[in-house]
Amino acid sequence: MAERTHACGKVTVEAVGQTVQLKGWVQKRRDLGGLIFIDLRDRTGIVQVVFNPETSKEALEVAETIRSEYVLHVEGTVVERGEGAINDNMATGRIEVQATKVNVLNAAKTTPIIIADDTDASEDVRLKYRYLDLRRPVMFNTFKMRHDVTKTIRNFLDTEEFLEVETPILTKSTPEGARDYLVPSRVHDGEFYALPQSPQLFKQLLMVGGFERYYQVARCFRDEDLRADRQPEFTQIDIEASFLTQDEILDMMERMMTKVMKDAKGVEVSAPFPRMKYADAMARYGSDKPDTRFEMELTDLSEFAAGCGFKVFTSAVESGGQVKAINAKGAASKYSRKDIDALTEFVKVYGAKGLAWLKVEEDGLKGPIAKFFGEEDANVLMNTLEATAGDLLLFVADKKSVVADSLGALRLRLGKELELIDESKFNFLWVTDWPLLEYDEDADRYFAAHHPFTMPFREDVELLETAPEKARAQAYDLVLNGYELGGGSLRIYERDVQEKMFKALGFSQEEAQEQFGFLLEAFEYGTPPHGGIALGLDRLVMLLAGRTNLRDTIAFPKTASASCLLTEAPSPVAEAQLEELNLKLNVKEEK
């Protein structure tokens, strides 16, 4: 078999007159009265191959048997297309290949999906036949971008003198957040490894070990409820460094991301990125990962609401809640009563009891609650919300968390429906100064907002024992277009501070020692100040490639129920395998 001389998408007018050897898949076959045209495809693109009896009867006879997705080896001569046959939408659109020989390397059944960017297959079919789905150019281009992003990051970190170090996949189960995936040990009867949710503890131990600068393209595993932007196994760019301040870490990440954007996407973004404190993000956008490509910020009306004539507002404030609103500029005529009812049902998903609304008309406020506001109150509302005729005002009165969640989500929905978002923009944002701990009323305990190893502000360390809810974290999230790209922090590196953190999280001294004794002991041997960040590679590629689902950036992803339709994993195992592990199943019968 002759060697391939050209990739299909790389045959251009410079090759006219040359004999070429091409190998690829049949994208399309057209029989035009004695001539057969085939679009031959490989990962670089498509080239048109012509089978003409005057050139080779033998090749034409073979071409008559060929169907879509056959794998071919074609030998032929490159010629220029006629003036009326030029296709400037293709890189190879000015030439075609006159076939002299063709060899069928492999035949193909009719595929269950159309191998094209626009396919009619459902996602389940695409996942079941993922190897066919991956043939679509849009999928290859996504993974080419993933490769380019990863290569750029590796090259950048190499110039910054970071070492790539692999950390264990089989590790210890620790209560860090989501449920662990557990792996039974055959050698240690009744004991289990856990797959890592992140390399957090190991990268900190590498800092104890004096490596100073570490990174890893790390596989991580979390047994959690899935959604469009979550997978049970995912990849993060894991970075840790000693002796750097928060500003130095953020500056380095900005330089890395601007290089990624330029090299992988061809987009120039300016640094430094804007910074916003967590409290401000929640107050202004109702989100800890705000999409700043459009305005429509939340306005706090609690002070006004406390003295207005609308009881729903006043009672919310009196009970410790708040009232906030968003002004959808010029949207009054675009939303009917039925449309607003749909918005009301939407905010109820986020815990809101309802959605109050007003439309601003030339002669004043109109809507179900307009009668509760006199002229003076109406003017205050209009001025506070900077409202003018044609605006739609939307209000939620509830607990602070419910107000933020519901209006934050509503803001994003309206931004999309009103086409306020410039999809060509890439708006990076740092969200800083996070709360260190969050209180869970159901569990009646505090949980770490990021993880238990986050360093509090120095002046807040004592608050861990007196007022944990007031302690602030030296933590930072990188946000892009309303998506959390990654999170990081400066880390605790002193045993006494780490023990205070564990105590605030409800660990007894014995539990902390049992779970994290190795880390606490390490902190007694001269641990350097350190910090880092973990960036979600899958999510970054999703945003840069313009995809809407993480599954499109992972070669062989899982479904929303964490199953693989291709291999049918998870699956039962043989009884002998269970016996070898001394395991017995207690499977609940379906009712």
Curated annotation (Swiss-Prot):
Compartment list: Cytoplasm
Ranges annotated as spanning the membrane: none
Keyword Cytoplasm: yes
Molecular function GO terms recorded: aspartate-tRNA ligase activity; aspartate-tRNA(Asn) ligase activity; ATP binding; catalytic activity, acting on a protein; nucleic acid binding; transferase activity
Region of interest called Aspartate, as start-end residue ranges on this chain: 200-203
Site annotation Important for tRNA non-discrimination: residues: 84
Binding of ATP, residues: 222-224, 231, 484, 536-539
One Pfam match: tRNA_anti-codon
Family: Belongs to the class-II aminoacyl-tRNA synthetase family. Type 1 subfamily.
Complexes and interactors: Homodimer.
PANTHER family: ASPARTATE--TRNA LIGASE, MITOCHONDRIAL, ASPARTYL/LYSYL-TRNA SYNTHETASE
Function field: Aspartyl-tRNA synthetase with relaxed tRNA specificity since it is able to aspartylate not only its cognate tRNA(Asp) but also tRNA(Asn). Reaction proceeds in two steps: L-aspartate is first activated by ATP to form Asp-AMP and then transferred to the acceptor end of tRNA(Asp/Asn).
Name of the protein in question: Aspartate--tRNA(Asp/Asn) ligase
Taxonomy of the source species: Bacteria, Bacillati, Bacillota, Bacilli, Bacillales
Name of the coding gene: aspS
